[in-house]
Regions:
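Structural signature of extracellular appendage/secretion-system components
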Residues: 1-439, 443, 448
């Protein structure tokens, strides 16, 4: 009769060995499976009536270093952040082109400079004039295109933030469901939680790629997930994120000004609290990197405009001078807005129908105006135009129109005028007309 218990003991040993081999085989087969961890089957002695009746498989445990896992989550968040930024930096690199590329801004600026040099050698050349206008149009079109694309990229980044928020909410649902299963199996003493724990760790990895997180475990096997700033994302139930993507971005559409929606949890805006992950990278792209690029582009455009206008205003109209001009700058309150001519001067020359000079003066040296309001300056110029010591044009008018634009009109089409900047002794002082934005329309180099 002792043979049967002995056979039972041997059989249990064989079954236990078979189970262990199955687990080892699974470990080998899944060595390259993402999220899979090594499983270890614990053997336990079977006691019946005080006697050993063989062995059986006990709890199947995982070989996991929890500290290493948390370090991985932090590194994964940083990687998600940098990957998101790199994706958009690659797009902007393509947009801007290489310095030596034909469509780059630097190449367009160089082409405009060449066109200016060529036209300066023969200002009567129609071909040179056309080429100059064409190169200026190419440059401005290119800069406008880049500006539009920058704003599209900002809008795309915000849409990707919304997509990441949706993905995070799905991952929180997954973690919540796995929590429930793990807690249930743990309380009932069922085996089989190891694979569920693997799935939960994999969900944590995916979540950490989107934003910076940390977690802690409760005795029942449940985990609580928070941001690294302590904002709860999962505690018994998910705390969902929300974000409404902007329909269309523009340079004035910003998160700081309220034009772009924040990222909310339980009604609290956590945008500034997100420290890492792809969402942080996208926020950086949308609110810092691309706006900085836009600012640099605007600065370049402003510098080009100021420099070209400054040089342009040192010349005169060709071939015909005008009898009236209207500026491009808008003055909101010309009675209070001030202008000061620190260096250099502005010369006014009046011509008759034969192109003969009939009168000339300068704003500072002749008229005697070096500082004051826009209205005061306009009155001084008008007084000179009407005076007997000047061109004696009683119908002449100088002022600010209903649109806030400064205008000069001789009041007699038989008399035209030219305005020329005169540089002072200091470098870079021939810029007075740029201050009031008066320019002659037949000067083809004008950018306004």
């Amino acid at each position: 009769m002792a043979l049967i218990p002995s056979l039972g003991t041997s059989l249990s040993g064989m079954k236990t060995a078979q189970s262990q081999l199955s687990i080892i085989s699974s470990n080998v087969a899944n060595v390259d499976t993402e999220g899979y961890t090594r499983k270890i089957a614990q053997q336990k002695n079977v006691i019946l009536a005080g006697y050993s009746q063989g062995v059986s498989i006990g709890e199947v445990t995982r070989k996991v270093n929890e500290g290493l896992l948390k370090s991985y989550l932090a590194a994964n968040s940083l990687n998600g952040n940098l990957a998101a930024q790199n994706s958009y930096l690659s797009k902007t690199e393509i947009l801007l082109g290489t310095p030596e590329g034909e469509n780059s801004v630097s190449a367009n600026v160089a082409a405009l400079q060449t066109a200016f040099d060529s036209f300066a050698s023969d200002v009567t050349s129609s071909a040179g004039r056309y080429n100059l206008l064409n190169q200026a149009d190419t440059l401005t079109s290119r800069m406008n295109y880049i500006s539009e694309e920058i704003q599209k990229l900002r809008g795309d980044a915000d849409m990707n933030i919304a997509a990441d928020v949706d993905e995070i909410n799905k991952l929180l649902d997954t973690l919540d469901n796995l929590n429930d299963q793990i807690v249930k199996y743990t309380l009932l003493g069922y085996d089989g939680t190891a694979d569920l724990l693997d799935q939960r760790d994999q969900a944590l990895r995916s979540l950490s790629e989107k934003m910076d997180i940390t977690y802690f475990k409760r005795d029942n096997g449940e985990i609580v997930v928070q941001t690294t700033n302590g904002i709860t994302l999962l505690d018994n139930d998910p705390h969902y994120l929300s974000h409404n993507a902007v329909a269309q971005a523009s340079p004035t559409t910003t998160y700081a000004a309220g034009g772009i929606d924040g990222i909310y949890v339980n009604g609290e805006d956590i945008t500034a609290s997100i420290k890492d992950g792809s969402i942080k990278g996208l926020i950086e792209v949308r609110d810092v990197i691309l706006p900085s690029l836009q600012s640099q582009l605007d600065e370049l455009a402003g510098a080009l405009k100021a420099q070209i206008n400054s040089v342009h205003n040192q010349g005169t109209a060709y071939p015909n001078t005008p009898s009236e001009l209207t500026g491009t700058r808008t003055f909101i309150d010309p009675d209070k807005q001030q202008i000061k001519i620190a260096e250099g001067d502005v010369r006014f020359v009046i011509f008759d129908t034969n192109g003969k000079q009939v009168a000339t003066t300068s704003l500072k040296g002749g008229i005697g105006f070096d500082s004051g309001s826009i209205s005061e300056m306009a009155q001084e110029i008008q007084d000179w135009l009407r005076s007997a010591d000047g061109p004696n044009l009683p119908q002449a008018e100088v002022g600010v129109d209903k649109n806030g634009k400064l205008f000069i009109n001789t009041g007699d089409s038989n008399y035209t005028f030219s305005i020329i900047d005169e540089a002072g002794s200091a470098a870079g002082t021939a810029q007075q007309l740029s201050l009031i934005h008066i320019s002659e329309p037949t000067r083809h180099a004008q950018i306004s």
